[in-house]
């Protein structure tokens, strides 16, 4: 679920404010996405978007009311390390790994302030 993804980012980047820092960044961070990612961090978001799209197509994730944004899973955080719980069902495990991989990707990618609130109509 999206609120868990925010918590995961705070795990890999302590002191960050995921909603303020990463929402509306580049062409893919935030709602929707199009065009070519502007940098490594934006590529993390594109990959995460694609991962959620793939989750919706999984047999184990036949969403009715649930979707990757609201479907919750179980995970733990220890010293910036995220572990998805082995007790998650197949769908929860998939979404947890989407979020885990993106949070790790975010933590390794440089942050370019000029890509925050980018004019997506012009650059994406």
Swiss-Prot record:
Q: Which InterPro entries match?
A: PLipase_A2 (IPR001211), PLipase_A2_Asp_AS (IPR033112), PLipase_A2_dom (IPR016090), PLipase_A2_dom_sf (IPR036444), PLipase_A2_His_AS (IPR033113)
Q: A single GO molecular function, which one? A: signaling receptor binding
Cofactor binding notes: Binds 1 Ca(2+) ion per subunit.
Catalysed reaction, written as an equation: a 1,2-diacyl-sn-glycero-3-phosphocholine + H2O = a 1-acyl-sn-glycero-3-phosphocholine + a fatty acid + H(+)
**Which UniProt keywords are given for this protein, alphabetically ordered?**
Calcium, Disulfide bond, Hydrolase, Lipid degradation, Lipid metabolism, Metal-binding, Secreted
GO biological process terms held by the UniProt record: arachidonate secretion; lipid catabolic process; phosphatidylcholine metabolic process; phosphatidylglycerol metabolic process
PROSITE patterns given for it?
Answer: PA2_ASP, PA2_HIS
Carries keyword Disulfide bond? yes
**What's the EC number here?**
3.1.1.4
- Cite the active-site annotation: 48, 99
Q: Where does Ca(2+) bind?
A: 28, 30, 32, 49
**Any miscellaneous information on file?**
This isozyme constitutes about 5% of the pancreatic phospholipase.
**Designated name of the protein:** Phospholipase A2, minor isoenzyme
Which species does this protein come from? Sus scrofa
């Amino acid at each position: 679920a999206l609120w868990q993804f925010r918590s995961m980012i705070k795990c890999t980047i302590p002191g960050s404010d995921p909603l303020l820092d990463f929402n509306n960044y580049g062409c893919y961070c935030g709602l929707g996405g199009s065009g070519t990612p502007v940098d490594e961090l934006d590529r993390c978001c594109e990959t995460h978007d694609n991962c959620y799209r793939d989750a919706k197509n999984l047999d184990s994730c036949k969403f009715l009311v649930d979707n990757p944004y609201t479907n919750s899973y179980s995970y733990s955080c220890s010293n910036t390390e995220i572990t998805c719980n082995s007790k998650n069902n197949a769908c929860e495990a998939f979404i947890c790994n989407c979020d885990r991989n993106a949070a790790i990707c975010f933590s390794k990618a440089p942050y370019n302030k000029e890509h925050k609130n980018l004019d997506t109509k012009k650059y994406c």
